[in-house]
């Protein structure tokens, strides 16, 4: 049975909607009104189309790259959704998946939510979705609301307001969004709310954040997943365990997953998703390092690719470095995650400028590199902190050596000639 798609609740208009169809059948949808974007994507899917939600903040060059990738795609039979993801070279990639790969997760997720909230069902509840819809978390949650008979509410601005929160029963977002909600409740004093569950992905939930939410009567379901794999494991406060229907295996410290939620195709380059077939089925890995206890509790130990988690987005350092190194003003570049109390990490860039930058001041160089990145990278990928050094250390193979933030701070400063 095809679920109906009620229009998401909007608190105000935020701009016009842009739809661009491609020869492959994929339609790019962008707009500043995220409720309208999600509503149109759901309608397009119900009509048999393949929605690809974009970012209204993209530069014209970035938008053209995405459209070129989408037009060149050859979607397999049954593909119903497309989502943008960042490649390791800085070029955009598009994930294609079947509707069933998301829908198979919703009954298990509904049971977890209902149990955490003390409800008999999630139907009829209102889901607050503050995530930018360019993230696959956005359309995943919007389809979830439609599939399970929930009302969808999308904030009208970048920040969550008391008006957005009023009447919301559950939140689907990142730790950053949960922090916003708790700060809002603190600021509003006696403000009454009915939020009972926060479904949180994109980064780990800090124990202190979970405890603060629970004191407010908000149960937290933190989950670990990946754009390629969807939901992998969930933590209701007792530890991160396999999501219903998902099997986990650890080999040489790396997590492998057996799941029916996996994306079907990747357009725009080689996939970083590893695939192995065995007697008990197909196992997939995105290279996350983990520990798995005897009683099934999963502990995340980082990514093999040193991925940066910032405000719920996953950024591969190599993707940003590739764009920086293409600038004539850059000789070497090192991108890393700088700790941030609210966002988890900030994308930071340590640059060894080339001789072409010798006559620029540090301020002008930073401004030029920011403009360079704005035309070529998604907003989440763009460096927010900049450091310029006279010498970036190299590995024996000649690549910049991966450094800890404390080591970066000790590098010799760059001074223009």
Give the residues covered by each predicted segment.
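AMP-binding/adenylate-forming
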Residues: 97-115, 126-181, 221
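Gly/Ser/Thr-rich phosphate-binding loop
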Residues: 183-238, 247-249
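AMP-binding/adenylate-forming catalytic core of the ANL superfamily
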Residues: 281-282, 287-381
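Conserved pre-ATP/AMP-binding loop-to-beta segment of ANL
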Residues: 26, 32-33, 70-84, 116-127
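AMP-binding/adenylate-forming catalytic domain of the ANL superfamily
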Residues: 375-399
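ATP-dependent adenylate-forming carboxylate-activation enzymes
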Residues: 31-35, 52-63, 130, 150-168, ...
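Conserved adenylation A10 loop of the ANL superfamily
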Residues: 79-96
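Conserved ATP/PPi-binding loop(s) of AMP-dependent carboxylate-activating enzymes
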Residues: 242, 251-282, 303, 313-315
């Amino acid at each position: 049975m095809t679920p109906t798609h009620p229009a998401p609740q909007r608190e105000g208009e935020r701009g016009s909607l842009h739809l661009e169809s491609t020869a492959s059948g994929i339609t790019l949808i962008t707009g500043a009104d995220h409720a309208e974007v999600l509503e149109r994507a759901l309608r397009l899917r119900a009509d048999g189309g393949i929605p690809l939600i974009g970012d209204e903040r993209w530069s014209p060059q970035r938008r053209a790259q995405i459209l070129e990738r989408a037009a060149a795609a050859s979607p397999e039979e049954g593909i119903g959704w497309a989502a943008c993801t960042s490649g390791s070279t800085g070029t955009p990639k598009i994930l294609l998946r079947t509707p069933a790969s998301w829908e198979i997760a919703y009954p298990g997720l509904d049971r977890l939510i209902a149990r955490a909230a003390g409800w008999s069902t999630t139907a009829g509840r209102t889901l607050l979705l503050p995530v930018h819809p360019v993230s696959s978390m956005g359309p995943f949650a919007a389809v979830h609301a439609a599939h399970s008979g929930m009302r969808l509410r999308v904030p009208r601005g970048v920040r969550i307001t008391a008006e957005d929160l009023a009447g919301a029963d559950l939140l689907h977002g990142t730790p950053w969004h949960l922090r916003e909600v708790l700060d809002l409740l603190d600021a509003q004093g006696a403000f009454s709310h009915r939020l009972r569950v926060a479904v949180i992905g994109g980064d780990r939930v800090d124990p202190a954040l979970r405890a603060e939410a629970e004191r407010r009567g908000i149960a937290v379901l933190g989950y670990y997943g990946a754009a390629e794999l969807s939901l992998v494991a969930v933590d209701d406060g007792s530890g991160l365990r396999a999501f219903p229907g998902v099997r986990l295996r650890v080999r040489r410290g790396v997590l492998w997953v057996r799941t029916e939620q996996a994306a079907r195709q990747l357009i725009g380059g080689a996939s970083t998703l590893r695939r192995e077939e065995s007697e008990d089925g197909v196992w997939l890995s995105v290279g996350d390092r983990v520990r798995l206890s005897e009683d099934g509790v999963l502990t995340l130990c980082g990514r093999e690719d040193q991925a940066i988690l910032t405000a719920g987005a996953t950024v591969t350092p190599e993707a940003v470095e590739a764009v920086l190194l293409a600038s004539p003003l850059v000789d070497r570049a090192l991108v890393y995650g700088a700790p941030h109390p609210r966002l988890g990490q900030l994308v930071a860039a340590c640059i060894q400028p080339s001789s072409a930058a010798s006559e620029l001041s540090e301020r002008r160089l930073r401004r030029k590199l920011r403009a360079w990145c704005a035309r070529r990278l998604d907003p989440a990928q763009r460096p927010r902190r900049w450091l310029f050094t006279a010498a970036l250390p190299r590995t024996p193979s000649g690549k910049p050596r991966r450094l800890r933030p404390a080591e970066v701070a000790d590098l010799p400063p760059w001074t223009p000639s």
